[in-house]
């Protein structure tokens, strides 16, 4: 054997020995940190785990009991960790275990290493193997995992026919800011309602001790994820975070992929998971408004499979004594289109609720995209006690799988302002938010909104709801919402400050004659000698000399600081540039005095009056079926004589067209082609606007408009006459016989 090959093999063997030693050390370290499980007596309460096909849902107090599990730090004796643990807040937490559908779940453990938590869908995960199933937990899922230490967690399986209770203490930082991925198994017993009633009277600490019930495991089923944290010395129980992770789940940058069973009809399988939440303005799970604590909430898992596309699918859900009137609830979930849908395709999916065959609430509409999970959220409020609630899922899909899990406390920054919530809950009945928080009024405006939702139109926005509410209740609304262009102006000012006195954002385009052709050029690159064409509304930042044209008016205040308008001529002109724009503005001190007089002459209430006037105009337009998105739209509509739109009342395409068959002829002997030709001759063929370009394009050849005529005078469009006019002379050619 050659020396070189032998040395290479020895090097490879050395590397393999190092890898083997590292694996052995890692295995020894895992086993040394394995925690113990304390098994209690098996004689107290035998609770049956609820299946997915559970009977009609009842109160959570009659159905559910959590399997209490606690994680305990085992490396607290180390010097580096001991000092850190003493500074942490010790909190007792109740976790719900996650199992699969097998009768026996093997014990499994894993080392959770601190890592970056990449948002709700982190890309880093560690596998936990259990009886062939694969469970992925985010590496930073446990709240006591940090960048400076390694936390060890062991999850133990439950054997059929045995009773287990897991309790201990969780050591965590004072601020629980990272989500903890856990799950729960549903249990029931006839005497559980009496136990919960007794514990509620004895106080939260006694309730915590007595609700740690032993579970007789017969069969387990995946139902969802939740975390209840009870803090010492506080009377409130909080649900910190909700997230679903099942065996075989994959976490990647595009979303959370779950191996849920799906039902496919045709080529569009579909599945969805919904969770019902409760929004408590006080911030506590068992806070005010007569709301029952989480232990008394409904718990139900069910599924309904559609059999036809575009079918209204329903999941009947009994809610007697659970949902309360005048309390805001949130419905949230994840939607996934099946593999049969083409990559990148999307479908609109809508969730609706019907309570007691009466009130129909829109729970949210989302455009689900194939290849990833799409989140859907909605908020609703009930006017009266609800006994039965039906969940509908509408969408362009052939099969669905809807799963509804426990109600949870839902918190968001939008509803943290109690004054904001109090104002809207007094005047609004329910809300839906997709990308923004939207409120809908309960008065007459709600009928208009319901018609819009029935027709499939866009849901009303916050601005329209606030305006209509203010008008209906005689409320004064001023400057609640800022126009988006105000922020754009701020960006422009910043760019102007950074780029100098002539930033690129202030450039304008003009028609410039180049090589005998008219082309659009930026006004800042004009040079002396360029010939430009100007029409109404053009801005020229240069000194020019008039070559030809008709009467027009030019505002020179931008160049000289003079606020007076110089009357020269009115219409189209061609100018010859003499010099580049002047660099300095001539400032006149008298402008200060004029500005003071101008501002002093404006009434202080004018902005309010204008805002209210525009709001009333928007409300009256809404009564007639015209919905305006911006207040300035009303002013723009005042300058229109004939609005053109499609059958839905919108303008989806910013392109003008003329239908030849609809052209009216008012002169005998004339036809539609002659009228179109006359219109084309009255249009500008060089520096055209949108209307002129549309009319000229109707001719077979654009040059046909000027063929055989000589233009004498052209009057461009002006706002007073609202027309263009041209004076021309026909050219008559005398042909003499000769050779062609």
Curated annotation (Swiss-Prot):
The keyword ATP-binding does not apply. PPR repeats lie at residues 469-503. SUPFAM superfamilies: Calcium ATPase, transduction domain A, Calcium ATPase, transmembrane domain M. InterPro entries: ATPase_P-typ_cyto_dom_N, ATPase_P-typ_TM_dom_sf, ATPase_P-typ_transduc_dom_A_sf, HAD_sf, Pentatricopeptide_rpt. The keyword Translocase does not apply. GO terms for molecular function: nucleotide binding. PROSITE patterns: PPR. Pfam families: E1-E2_ATPase. Keywords: Transposable element. It comes from the Eukaryota. Bs1 is probably an active plant retrotransposon. PANTHER family: CALCIUM-TRANSPORTING ATPASE (PTHR42861). This is Putative Pol polyprotein from transposon element Bs1. It comes from Zea mays (Maize).
């Amino acid at each position: 054997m050659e020396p070189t090959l032998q040395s290479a093999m020895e090097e490879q063997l050395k590397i393999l020995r190092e890898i083997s030693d590292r694996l052995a050390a890692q295995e020894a370290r895992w086993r040394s940190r394995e925690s113990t499980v304390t098994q209690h007596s098996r004689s107290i309460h035998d609770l049956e785990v609820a299946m997915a096909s559970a009977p009609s849902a009842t109160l959570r107090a009659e159905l559910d009991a959590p399997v209490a599990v606690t994680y305990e730090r085992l490396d607290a004796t180390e010097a580096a960790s001991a000092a850190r643990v003493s500074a942490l807040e010790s909190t007792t937490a109740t976790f719900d275990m996650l199992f699969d559908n097998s009768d026996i779940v093997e014990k499994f453990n894993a080392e959770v290493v601190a890592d970056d938590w990449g948002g709700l869908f982190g890309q880093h995960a560690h596998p936990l193997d259990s009886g062939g199933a694969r469970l992925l937990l985010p590496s930073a899922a446990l709240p006591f995992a940090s960048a400076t230490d390694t936390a060890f967690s062991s999850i133990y399986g439950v054997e059929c026919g045995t009773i287990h209770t897991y309790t201990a203490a969780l050591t965590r930082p004072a601020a629980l800011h990272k989500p903890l991925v856990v799950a729960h198994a549903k249990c029931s017993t006839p005497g559980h309602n009496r136990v919960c009633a007794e514990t509620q009277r004895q106080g939260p600490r006694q309730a915590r001790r007595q609700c740690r019930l032993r579970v007789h495991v017969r069969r387990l089923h995946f139902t969802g994820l939740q975390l209840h944290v009870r803090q010492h010395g506080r009377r409130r129980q909080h649900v910190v975070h909700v997230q679903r992770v099942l065996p075989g789940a994959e976490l990647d940058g595009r979303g959370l992929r779950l191996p849920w069973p799906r039902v496919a009809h045709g080529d569009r399988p579909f599945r969805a998971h919904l969770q019902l939440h409760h929004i408590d303005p006080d911030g506590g799970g068992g806070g005010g408004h007569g709301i029952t604590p989480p232990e008394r909430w409904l718990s139900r898992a069910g599924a309904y499979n559609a059999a036809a596309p575009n079918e209204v699918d329903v999941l009947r859900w009994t809610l007697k004594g659970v949902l309360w009137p005048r309390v805001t609830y949130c419905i949230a979930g994840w939607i996934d289109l099946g593999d049969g849908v083409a990559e990148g395709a999307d479908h609109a999916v809508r969730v609706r609720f019907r309570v007691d065959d009466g009130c129909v609430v829109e729970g949210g509409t989302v455009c689900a995209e194939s290849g990833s999970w799409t989140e859907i959220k909605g908020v609703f409020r009930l006017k009266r006690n609800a006994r039965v609630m039906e969940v509908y899922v509408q969408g362009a899909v052939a099969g669905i799988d809807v799963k509804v899990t426990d109600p949870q406390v839902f918190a968001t920054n939008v509803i943290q302002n109690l004054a904001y919530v109090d104002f809207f809950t007094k005047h609004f009945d329910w809300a839906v938010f997709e990308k923004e928080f939207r409120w809908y009024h309960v008065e007459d405006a709600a009928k208009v909104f319901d018609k819009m939702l029935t027709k499939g139109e866009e849901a009303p926005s916050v601005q329209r709801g606030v305006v209509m509410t203010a008008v209906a209740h005689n409320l004064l609304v001023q400057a609640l919402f800022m126009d988006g262009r105000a922020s754009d102006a701020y960006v422009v000012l910043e760019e102007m400050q950074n780029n100098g006195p002539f930033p690129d954002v202030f450039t304008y385009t003009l028609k410039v004659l180049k090589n005998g052709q008219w082309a659009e050029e930026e006004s800042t690159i004009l040079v002396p000698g360029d010939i430009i064409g100007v029409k109404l509304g053009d801005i020229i930042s240069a000194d020019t000399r008039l070559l030809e044209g008709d009467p027009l008016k030019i505002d020179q205040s931008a160049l000289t600081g003079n606020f007076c308008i110089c009357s020269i001529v009115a219409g189209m002109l061609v100018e010859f540039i003499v010099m580049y724009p002047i660099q300095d503005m001539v400032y006149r001190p008298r402008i200060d005095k004029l500005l003071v007089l101008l501002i002093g002459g404006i009434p202080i209430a004018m902005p309010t009056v204008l805002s209210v006037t525009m709001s009333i105009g928007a409300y009256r337009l809404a009564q007639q079926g015209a919905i305006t998105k911006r207040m300035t739209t009303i002013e723009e509509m005042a300058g229109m004589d004939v609005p053109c739109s499609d059958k839905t009342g919108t303008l989806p395409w910013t392109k003008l067209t003329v239908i030849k068959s609809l052209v009216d002829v008012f002169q005998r002997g004339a036809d539609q082609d002659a009228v179109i030709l006359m219109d084309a001759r009255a249009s500008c063929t060089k520096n055209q606007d949108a209307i002129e370009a549309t009319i000229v394009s109707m001719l077979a050849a654009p040059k046909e408009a000027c063929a055989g005529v000589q233009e004498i005078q052209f009057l461009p469009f002006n706002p007073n006459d609202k027309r263009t006019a041209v004076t021309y002379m026909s050219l008559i050619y005398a042909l003499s016989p000769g050779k062609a």
